[in-house]
């Protein structure tokens, strides 16, 4: 009898690089991968199906705006941009829970290169706060563990009067 795999979801999945690392271990079962860009989602579906042998890859990849968390959880129908999906609640219920959340929000607002290129140093960039959607996923699904990755520039990014890393750390601490 085989070992039970660790059930994971990947947020801000991009083309699936982080997910691939977890899948390569052989210990993880990717329940869902959330990404809002069309081309990376097609790549994710292909990787899950062809490389990792998930026959239901299209259902596991949720192409949606993670900031619309209520719909992301409950599902959506006939959205002009994103079509229809059952949402994370149903996928996670079908998997009988979730063990790990992996992912990291887009790095442009945190990276030193991104801040140098922007005349306001990315202080007004909404991506500074996409971690809040990650927190909502943690609060609702209560995984045993999470992996939140990003660029080294996150340690010095300061969109307001406080370093963003302090705000993120406090949010994680409050979540438990």
What are the language-model segments listed below?
Residues 1-176:
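Conserved active-site and SAM-binding loop architecture
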């Amino acid at each position: 009898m085989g070992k039970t795999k660790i059930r994971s979801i990947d947020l801000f999945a991009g083309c699936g690089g982080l997910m691939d690392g977890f899948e390569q271990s052989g210990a993880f079962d990717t329940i869902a991968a959330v990404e809002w860009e069309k081309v990376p989602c097609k790549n994710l579906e292909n990787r899950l199906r062809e490389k990792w042998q998930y026959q239901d890859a299209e259902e596991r990849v949720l192409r949606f705006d993670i900031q619309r968390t209520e719909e992301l959880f409950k599902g959506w129908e006939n959205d002009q941009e994103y079509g229809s999906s059952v949402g994370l609640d149903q996928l996670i219920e079908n998997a009988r829970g979730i063990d790990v959340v992996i992912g990291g929000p887009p790095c442009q607002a945190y990276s030193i290169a991104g801040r140098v290129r922007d005349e306001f140093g990315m202080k007004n960039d909404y991506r500074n706060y996409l971690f809040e959607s990650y927190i909502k996923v943690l609060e609702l699904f209560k995984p045993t563990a999470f992996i939140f990755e990003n660029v080294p520039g996150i340690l010095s990014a300061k969109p307001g009067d406080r370093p963003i890393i302090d705000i993120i750390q406090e949010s994680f601490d409050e979540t438990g």
